[in-house]
Amino acid sequence: MALQTPVLSPATPTVMAESALYRQRLEVIAEKRRLQEEIGAARRELEEEKLRVERLKRKSLRERWLMDGAAEGPERPEEPASKDPQSPEGQAQARIRNLEDSLFSLQSQLQLLQSASTGAQHRPAGRPAWRREGPRPLSQSAMEAAPTAPTDVDKRTSLPDAPVGMSPESPSDPREESIAVLPASRPSTEAIGTSSEANGPCPGHSPLPEQLSLGVSSVTKAKGDGAVEVVWAGLRATENSATGPTDVELEAKVEEVVLEAIGARQGTSSPELPTWVKEGRGVVEVVWEGLGGRDLDVTGESGRDAEATHTSSRRLQEQFEAETCRKEEGASRDSLEGVGQGGPGVEEGSFIWVERVALSEDWEEILMEGLEAPQGAGSAGEPEALIGAQPRGGEASWEVEKREVEKVEGIEEKGRAEKLGAEREDGVAVLPDETQGREENEAEKVERKDSEGPFPAEIATDEEKWEVKTTEGEESLEVEKGGEAEPVTTEKPLVTEKKPEGSLETERKGSEMPLDQEKDGEGSLDRESKTTEILLDGEIGDKSSLDETKGSKKLLDEKTGGEGSLDEEAEGSKKLLDREADGIEPFSEVDKTSGAKDDVSPEEQGKANEGAEFQAEDASPPGATVCVQDEPRSEEQGQQEPEKQEGLVEGAASKPEPCTEREGPPGDATLLLAETPAPEQPVESQPLLHQEASSTNPGDHPAPTYAPAQQLELAEAKEASGPKQKTCQCCVVM
């Protein structure tokens, strides 16, 4: 055969080697042409045989019909032909089978030859026959039929190494060649969990490897405690994400990964549970760590599928602050929010998005309610709410989902909101001395904390929250009327409202500072609000929660700038309060932009004193409110009215902390979780999922007796109006 030229050893002179290779190439071309001609002849003969058989069948059928006088069915004519090999039809069928076999053997020879001429250069010499492994089930017979096949295998390594495009010959059947190539590439892609296919099409430049550090790899774990944890480790942006992937690329990646992890994603309109939801599960917790941007709508869609999206309030607040600051200052900050493009409408910072979804028999009802806002608005609006301080209709849908979840959870969150108010009161103390750098660090770390989980103090006081919730559910209703409703963290806007307008604005600016620098340069207020917010998470609940707040502050310090001293813990408690204030502040900032901010604060101050915080928390997603709400509020309620104004404003100023406080899956943020848990408090150390499970399932705690429907309605109205921020919550509720 053509390939039987002697194998060239490396010692052969280059001139002789080139001539031999050229000769080999010519021989291969000639052999290919011969095989192609044989294949063409065999195909023509096969077609002729088939036509002949058809004619014979029709002829026999006609004869039988004439003989019998009636067509008794096409079956009878076929039977004798199939049973009698001597009949012309039987002989034709046998010839057809032989022709098909010979044609297949010729095709396999040609394929082997092509792989020898083009595939040897792709493979090491030790594996010359790799192409024969997958594509041809009948390759064995082909090898037997081709006497030169063994020599082909032996000589294949000596074939030319020129690129495939250089060889003039073209495969007779491109499909055969492609079939041969595919199996070679498949094993590697299958072995690697994240193949380019899974990540979806990347229209533009692909993100740098350090930016998508782990590749877009999603780990979905079914936890024994009844929660599903989906951790997106791959889309986490590193500090130098300025050159990060564009929104379109990220959208494609996130969409592919989400679809892959969730399986069959179902729209909000579909009543049945998604395939990834199992009946016995009470809580589904999804942590999105990735690059922020308009592409969040993909994740938002998945969240809607899960019946409601609980996004960590702190992260939303941070992003609101970042975007408002960008609009006002037109510059991107060093914080994670500012790492990406500094455009006012786009935020490309790293975010950790924790979705906590409560699954219950109310699934259908909640899904239908989620439809109150158009699906498009939900998908596009949720990300916008997360990304920027520009309130949008999407936020309304986002909040509607939250309200649905809240209904499932019952009044749990109302109690938490009340606790939030108390926490804020306790953490009224503000530390103006903290520096902007520290605030920025805190903001960045707060973002991470988002998914890490609520502070241990919050977990510990979850039951207390329930008790306070029942007693203070009414207060939460009042608060809803009085307090501004942030799409994510209503509680914080309430705090802001309670404070004087001037202080509110200052604190809001302060909360913006950590993310995007203060609008007015009031760094001290921002620091104060952040510090107070930090305390709010752990300390507001009780005086005893001071220890918890210290632990939480330590966590904050670890993330913010390593401020771990006990003195700083005291400051940290203040920071917690401030951070809660920051959570409100994003909305207050929005109010500033809209011009209604000042108006809202005075009106809401009075109402908020009564219990605006409680309702704000109710309106806010259970996860977001949980962080602050978890603190026991019964003790703090007494202090709430006097301290609320200060604490609330501070809470609004420190937006990032609420997110941190907000529960994140215990292992949500790979790095963040380790930082967040406070070793001091065993309750805090408990995984957030447990807390969430208890909070999400009203059955775990006695359901409050006061009418939840009205409160939910108030929360819904509040949430719907919250994103717009153009009218105060009290006016909206009225």
UniProtKB/Swiss-Prot annotation:
Record membrane topology: Lipid-anchor
S-palmitoyl cysteine: lipidated positions: C728, C730
Keyword Cell membrane: yes
Location in the cell: Cytoplasm; Cell membrane
Keywords from the named record: ATP-binding, Cell membrane, Coiled coil, Cytoplasm, Lipoprotein, Membrane, Methylation, Nucleotide-binding, Palmitate, Phosphoprotein, Prenylation, Repeat
GO biological process entries: regulation of cell shape
Region called Disordered, residue ranges: 62-100, 114-217, 297-347, 374-400, 413-709
Phosphothreonine modifications at: T311
Cystine pairings recorded for this chain: none
Ranges of Basic and acidic residues composition bias in the record: 73-82, 297-308, 315-336, 413-427, 435-452, 462-484, 494-531, 540-561, 571-582, 589-607, 630-647
Pfam families the record matches: Paralemmin (PF03285)
MF term (GO), any: ATP binding
Family: Belongs to the paralemmin family.
Function: ATP-binding protein, which may act as a adapter in the Toll-like receptor (TLR) signaling.
Subunit annotation: Interacts with SIGIRR.
Protein's name according to its UniProt entry: Paralemmin-3
